[in-house]
């Protein structure tokens, strides 16, 4: 598979994928099947409608080679959707789309899993999934001594710990689960006591994280 770009001459047609990347033409050859600028712009329009966060620059980088398996997977799903559900797909775009699907699926042997999101608050605040103190939590007394205690890592694997204070289950639905350790009961009824006997055992061969 080869990606061809050009910034010389007149632009083939007015489309943001070309204009925003300062290109006059863009095409891909997949096993001797030519995918034109118009076909790629058509695919971009559908992919961006399904994934609004992707812009023209990101899509061009994607065409040259996806950075991670999640990005690649979403792009392949778009190509499959076009082939299976798009009633407006021009017939001349069908074969290029098929060949692109066949070519891009091979990237799975090269891409790496996406690293954990740096937007996860618990991942940023907790070192090695250890409890950490917070100045306040809505629904608890302002003078309470509070800790956030992770009970699973970012991938959902349970975290074992040793705790000396009462734990309360957080109503948070976030992926990285945690409970709240407090020396005073909560003021809000939405927090309930959390008891997990397996989590109160120390890790073999390691020192427990004591609050």
UniProtKB/Swiss-Prot annotation:
<keyword id="KW-1035">Host cytoplasm</keyword>
<keyword id="KW-0941">Suppressor of RNA silencing</keyword>
<dbReference type="GO" id="GO:0030430">
    <property type="term" value="C:host cell cytoplasm"/>
</dbReference>
<dbReference type="GO" id="GO:0052170">
    <property type="term" value="P:symbiont-mediated suppression of host innate immune response"/>
</dbReference>
<keyword id="KW-0945">Host-virus interaction</keyword>
<keyword id="KW-0694">RNA-binding</keyword>
<dbReference type="Pfam" id="PF05310">
    <property type="entry name" value="Tenui_NS3"/>
</dbReference>
<dbReference type="InterPro" id="IPR043105">
    <property type="entry name" value="Tenui_NS3"/>
</dbReference>
<comment type="similarity">
    <text>Belongs to the tenuiviruses p3 protein family.</text>
</comment>
<protein>
    <recommendedName>
        <fullName>Suppressor of RNA silencing p3</fullName>
    </recommendedName>
</protein>
<comment type="subunit">
    <text>Homodimer.</text>
</comment>
<dbReference type="GO" id="GO:0003723">
    <property type="term" value="F:RNA binding"/>
</dbReference>
<dbReference type="InterPro" id="IPR007974">
    <property type="entry name" value="Tenui_movmnt_prot"/>
</dbReference>
<keyword id="KW-1090">Inhibition of host innate immune response by virus</keyword>
<comment type="function">
    <text>Acts as a suppressor of RNA-mediated gene silencing, also known as post-transcriptional gene silencing (PTGS), presumably through the binding of dsRNA.</text>
</comment>
<keyword id="KW-0899">Viral immunoevasion</keyword>
């Amino acid at each position: 598979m080869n990606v061809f770009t050009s910034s010389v001459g007149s632009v083939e047609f007015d489309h943001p994928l070309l204009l925003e990347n300062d290109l006059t033409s863009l095409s891909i050859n997949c096993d001797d099947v030519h995918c034109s600028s118009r076909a790629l712009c058509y695919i971009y329009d559908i992919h961006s409608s399904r994934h609004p966060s992707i812009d023209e620059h990101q899509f061009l980088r994607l065409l040259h080679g996806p950075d991670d398996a999640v990005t690649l997977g979403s792009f392949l799903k778009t190509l499959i959707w076009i082939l299976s559900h798009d009633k407006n797909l021009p017939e001349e775009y069908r074969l290029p789309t098929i060949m692109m699907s066949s070519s891009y699926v091979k990237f799975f042997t090269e891409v790496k899993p996406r690293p954990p999101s740096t937007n996860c608050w618990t991942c940023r605040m907790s070192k090695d999934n250890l409890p950490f103190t917070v100045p306040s939590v809505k629904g608890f007394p302002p003078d309470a001594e509070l800790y956030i205690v992770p009970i699973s890592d970012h991938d959902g694997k349970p975290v074992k710990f040793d705790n000396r204070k009462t734990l309360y289950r957080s109503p948070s639905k976030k992926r990285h689960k945690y409970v709240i350790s407090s020396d005073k009961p909560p003021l809000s009824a939405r927090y309930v006591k959390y008891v997990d006997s397996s989590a109160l055992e120390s890790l073999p061969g390691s020192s427990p994280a004591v609050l």
